[in-house]
Amino acid sequence: MFALTNSEIVARCPQVFQTNYSKARTKKYGQYTTAQVIDALRTEGYEVTNAFSQARTPGQFSKHCVRLSHRDFLDTLHPDETRPEIVIVNSHDGSSSFRIMAGIFRLVCSNGLIIADEQTADNRICHWKGNSFDSVINTALLVAEQAKESYELIDQMKAQNLTPQQQKDYATKAAQIRLAYNKKSQVNFAENLLVPHRHEDNITPSIWNTYNVVQENCIKGGQLVGSRVLRPLTNISQNVEVNRKLWNEATALLA
């Protein structure tokens, strides 16, 4: 995958280059623009690979998500066609902190995973003037290293297979996470979550393969839920939380 230029980022997510913030904020508000962070991380070798927002209207302060990867991984992927990433969520409407998380991008399904465990914490930096810009960048670089270190855990997930019942139990928990608002449809939805979209995800019933199949189905949607087709999970906050919970449930299966 190629790095996005600034013009390509603007076309996808103009909020990244928003330099103002909501006038409802107090004088204590300290703004860390997403564009500033991107520029600083580019000097460290990182490039934007994806950017999207919950609102497409230029000039708004809405929440947006940016994923970055080191240039070394843009040319040479991990043997299983994945790469570690920095995931940034930000807004300038005062509704949230600057959020930095570790992620994994899987090329085969163009899907972004978010890692969640004790070692790869969810870093939230408040927008207030007491926090330095350097602390944001240092946190992002630390998260990038944590994403690389997560491959040891991924290798363990690949090495351990699940029984059919364990797969069903994981899918059931995933359905409860994704359809927390619709308990009646969770049972049928759980069965659909285990349907793979590609042959390589069905070779072995490993934790890693099971997790990837379920995660992709939860995020991308397309399954019949009641009388409706489930839509992709585009809400950034919900996407992040579902992703993190699915990861936690998957790693909990490790013996």
Where in this protein do the model-derived segments appear?
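N-terminal low-complexity, intrinsically disordered segments
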Residues: M1-H64, R71
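A generic structural signal for solvent-exposed, polar alpha-helical segments
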Residues: A35-I38, F52, R67, D134, ...
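Intrinsically disordered, low-complexity regions enriched in serine/threonine
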Residues: D72-A255
